[in-house]
Amino acid sequence: MIPLIETSALLLGLTALLAYLLGSVPFGIMMARLFGLGDLRSVGSGNIGATNVLRTGNKLAAFLTLVLDAGKGAIAVFLARALLGEDAAQLAGFAAFLGHCFPVFLGFKGGKGVATFLGTLLALAWPIGLAACAIWAITAAVFRMSSLAALVAAALSPLAAFTLGLPSAVVFCAALATLIFLRHRGNISRIAKGQEPKIGKTS
């Protein structure tokens, strides 16, 4: 008989792997091809997320990419929670986020992870997710920069978790926020120079 602790570790490892593979699905590239927009990696910033799809001028493709990228994070969390509990849900959300940023199907060269981050938060603790989405929306509306909105939402998510009385999510939010900042290094440089493209600007 396999010891219980080994079984639990095996299940957690399998959950993380499946969540990572789900996160690795490049919905942006798939939507771009489905709508005849070409290879998304050769468009605009070359990023595989919804913002870059929007640069093609196809709002429906961008919307579907946003929903699907957020959805894969949410689905990973919901399934892991239903099967194994809250710790597994956080692990699955983190793994799905890593899958989007470093997808095995694209040679580990993926997106910035913002939509998957928001979808994961909405599924993991919806008050934090709603707060992050609201912060993103307000910042985007004021400054018209998706990257800046993502950075502000990510930076404030640990504070939102703490303020809302969800201490178990503080470290999770901080870890994902750190990765989002690392993935946005180029954007941060362009923002500082006043060269960051505005939302909706076509390629």
UniProtKB/Swiss-Prot annotation:
InterPro entries: G3P_acylTferase_PlsY. GO terms for biological process: phospholipid biosynthetic process. Its EC number is 2.3.1.275. Coiled coil: none annotated. It is found in: Cell inner membrane. The keyword GTP-binding does not apply. Pathway: Lipid metabolism; phospholipid metabolism. The keyword Membrane applies. It catalyses: an acyl phosphate + sn-glycerol 3-phosphate = a 1-acyl-sn-glycero-3-phosphate + phosphate. It holds the Pfam family G3P_acyltransf. SMART domains: G3P_acyltransf. It is a multi-pass membrane protein. GO terms for cellular component: plasma membrane. The chain crosses the membrane at residues 10-30, 60-80, 88-108, 118-138, 162-182. Catalyzes the transfer of an acyl group from acyl-phosphate (acyl-PO(4)) to glycerol-3-phosphate (G3P) to form lysophosphatidic acid (LPA). This enzyme utilizes acyl-phosphate as fatty acyl donor, but not acyl-CoA or acyl-ACP. Belongs to the PlsY family. This is Glycerol-3-phosphate acyltransferase. It comes from Jannaschia sp. (strain CCS1).
